[in-house]
Amino acid sequence: MRIVFVHPNYHSGGAEIAGSWPPAWVAYLCGALKKAGYTDYHFIDAMTDYVSHEKLAEKLRELQPDIVATTAITPSIYVAEETLKVAMEVVPNALRVLGGIHATFMFRQVLEEAPWIDVIVRGEGEEVLVNLVKAYEADNFAETRRQVKGLAFLDGDEIVSTAAAPTIRDVDSIDPDWGIINWKNYIYEPLGVRVAIPNMARGCPFTCSFCSQWKFWRDYRVRDPKKVVDEIEKLVNEHGVGFFILADEEPTINRKKFIEFCEEMIARGLPDKVKWGINTRVTDVKRDKELLKFYRKAGLVHISLGTEAAAQLKLDVFNKETTVAENKEAIRLLREADIFTEAQFIVGLDNETKETLEETYRMAWDWQPDLANWSMYTPWPFTPLFQELRDQVEVFDYSKYNFVTPIMKPKALTRGELLDGVMNNYRRFYMKKALFHYPWRGTGFRRRYLLGCLKAFLKAGVGRTFYDLGKAGYWGPQSKDKVDFHFDETRKIGNAQMADWEASADRAAKAAERREALRVQGKARAEERNAAKAEAAPILTAGGGGCGGHADGSDCGCGGKKQQQVDEFHVPMACGGGRQQMAEDEFAMPMACGGGKQQMEEAEERLVRPAE
């Protein structure tokens, strides 16, 4: 069974500024296949190698695979669809498989616009792919595919989605095959060294309304830190990796395991060989302020903070549990620990104005992070915030959903003015940094790293790839009214996808009604219990029982403590700083407290909606 994986040839002016990133997904899938006994797999990185459709066709003809598989995030979905169309034309007997976050949630749309796709893998891919390959090897695949969990496909005119596959419980069993990667192609520009993107955990327990990772991975699972360091040691010693970024949404959530990870890195002497970076939350930085220098000793040199917005209003919209003041304090703490800070700002919401854009610049300069990024709000079509803002979304050309193209149009700005405002922030921030900070502050590694970051920005700017400025035709303030983002206006939401959204909205409304009924019922029962307690209080007091127990003072079984009453419908919910998780059936749905504001909609949806 020969399997060929293809990374789609999609480019934007965002993350590529810092270098070429190795597609970790293929290493993890190949590791699962290898463990299951499938070793005849190949990889074509059409993105890094700029492989055209014609060249891809040649490679597929040469390899003659039994299965061609690719993946897609939202902006690369059309290229991924075209990749499998090429496969259909040159190796028509090969099974064509698509995975990734976009296809997982938008499979109806994808199958409607690209019916040549044979199978979509939904959700976490390792176990689902192995089961799919086994089913494809067996006879009568048209029938056996219906028994494989985590798939979607067309059967005639019917869009079929099988039951959701459970998440991988034993994350320590994950063993990626990094040997599938051609490492000389993946360089981290600021340091000029090979870069990797391993992960320490799967999932995220928070429910930020603009993000979809918590929906895709579902529950939060952390690997054994020693096994993660085993993997990193292999990347360093066998593949020459000199820098890595933990792919986790927030690796510091589990403080104990993150500390163990750092201790293991130090014990093996790895900080002298490899540096690394993470994304994390401001609250975790403040929590661990006494440990930041220890983290730096373990090789952690770069932290990207989701400050998200200068205006507190925006933080509230995004369901962030931080304040503007906390953002500034976290950056100060990291600076004192000699850890490079990168502040992330989201711009382009409906309430954006010239004044709010200017405010983000002023705060960025006041906070003094080493780096600052302004990303366009991108309404992933499968997030809660997209559903709330759907009437305001005018662009459904997903190839532009890349954080650098203004998908949303603020009421007070044109898209060209929004882009110009963002570029004005970049120009001022990095011009000042280049003249007064980077060359003169610090020595050795700090100076080299900052100048390397500046070089990466300049390289992208001169090449007109930064923020896709060349494609948009932006040359400065004088061109803001002439920019063209080349939106494909023929792209619309598919009928099947729209019908599913409407059905989901109806289910959500019914769930909300049930929650309200339960709330009223619970309140009434509480009042009844309180009334009963008040009526019985004199008798119980006279009896002398410590909790209102037996008259002779003997134990009534409650241990002298208030006993919790459990209604028919009881959901365990605790304000643990956003870290409480709730399990329902085979799902473990993360629940974020948001400072006491629990979000139940997703969990309720799991209860009332059959698994697809």
Swiss-Prot record:
Residues 190-417 form the Radical SAM core domain. GO terms for molecular function: 4 iron, 4 sulfur cluster binding; cobalamin binding; metal ion binding; oxidoreductase activity. The keyword S-adenosyl-L-methionine applies. Binds 1 [4Fe-4S] cluster. Binds 1 adenosylcobalamin. Its EC number is 1.21.98.3. SMART domains: Elp3. Keywords: 4Fe-4S, Bacteriochlorophyll biosynthesis, Chlorophyll biosynthesis, Cobalamin, Cobalt, Iron, Iron-sulfur, Metal-binding, Oxidoreductase, Photosynthesis, S-adenosyl-L-methionine. Residues 9-143 form the B12-binding domain. It comes from the Bacteria. It holds the Pfam family Radical_SAM. One of its GO terms (biological process) is photosynthesis. [4Fe-4S] cluster binds at C204, C208, C211. GO terms for cellular component: cytosol. Its cofactor is [4Fe-4S] cluster; adenosylcob(III)alamin. It catalyses: Mg-protoporphyrin IX 13-monomethyl ester + 3 S-adenosyl-L-methionine + H2O = 3,8-divinyl protochlorophyllide a + 3 5'-deoxyadenosine + 3 L-methionine + 4 H(+). Pathway: Porphyrin-containing compound metabolism; bacteriochlorophyll biosynthesis (light-independent). Involved in the tetrapyrrole biosynthetic pathways leading to chlorophyll and bacteriochlorophyll (BChl). Catalyzes the anaerobic formation of the isocyclic ring (E-ring) in Mg-protoporphyrin monomethyl ester (MPE) to yield protochlorophyllide a (PChlide a) via a six-electron oxidation and the formation of an oxo group at position C13 using oxygen from a water molecule. Belongs to the BchE family. This is Anaerobic magnesium-protoporphyrin IX monomethyl ester cyclase. It comes from Cereibacter sphaeroides (strain ATCC 17023 / DSM 158 / JCM 6121 / CCUG 31486 / LMG 2827 / NBRC 12203 / NCIMB 8253 / ATH 2.4.1.) (Rhodobacter sphaeroides). The lineage of its organism: Bacteria, Pseudomonadati, Pseudomonadota, Alphaproteobacteria, Rhodobacterales. The gene is bchE.
